[in-house]
């Protein structure tokens, strides 16, 4: 069965929590993810590969601006285009948005390369933004309906 991307719902928020727990140094709890289901500004997606939860993307959209909160792909599913597919799915779903913003660890070259390939541009940085370990964040933005 090919990759399937679905909106996170009551049947998949625990899958999203498991992905985050495996991949992120500060994962959201199941409770927080469940609360996201009732947030009208929250849009979360889960990617399944052969029926197995493989990736997760969480964004908030407010006044046409998308803030990418978390993206994670389980290690055994990495380098298969899942993160890119999640991002492209989100762009399609939120087609009326004007821009998308994210932070990426300075050392995360693979993620930064993915974001650049999707049209994100570096717009700044935040000193010591991340902990475990302490690291700067690179700020990136993509204008969704034409370059500004």
Could you describe each region identified by the protein language model?
Residues 2-5:
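Extreme N-terminal starter segment of soluble prokaryotic enzymes
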Residues 7-76, 87-89, 93, 143-147:
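Acetyl-CoA-dependent GNAT
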Residues 34, 108, 129-130:
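Conserved beta-strand edge residues that scaffold enzyme active sites
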Residues 64, 69, 98-100, 136:
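A generic structural signal for short beta-strands and their flanking turns/coil linkers
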Residues 70, 74-88, 105-113, 117-118:
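Conserved glycine-rich acetyl-CoA-binding loop
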Residues 101-103, 116, 121-138:
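Conserved catalytic-core motifs of GNAT/GCN5-like acyltransferases
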């Amino acid at each position: 069965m090919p990759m399937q991307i679905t909106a996170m719902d009551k049947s998949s928020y625990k899958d999203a929590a498991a992905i985050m727990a495996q991949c992120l140094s500060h994962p959201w709890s199941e409770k927080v993810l469940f609360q996201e289901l009732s947030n009208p500004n929250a849009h979360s997606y889960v990617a399944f590969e052969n029926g197995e939860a493989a990736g997760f993307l969480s964004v908030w959209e407010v006044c046409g601006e998308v803030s990418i909160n978390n993206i994670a792909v389980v290690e055994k599913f990495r380098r298969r285009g899942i993160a890119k597919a999640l991002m492209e799915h989100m762009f399609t779903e939120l087609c009326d948005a004007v821009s998308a913003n994210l932070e990426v660890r300075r050392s995360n070259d693979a993620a930064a390369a993915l974001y650049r390939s999707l049209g994100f541009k570096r717009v700044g940085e935040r000193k010591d933004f991340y902990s475990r370990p302490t690291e700067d964040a690179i700020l990136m933005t993509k204008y969704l309906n034409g370059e500004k």
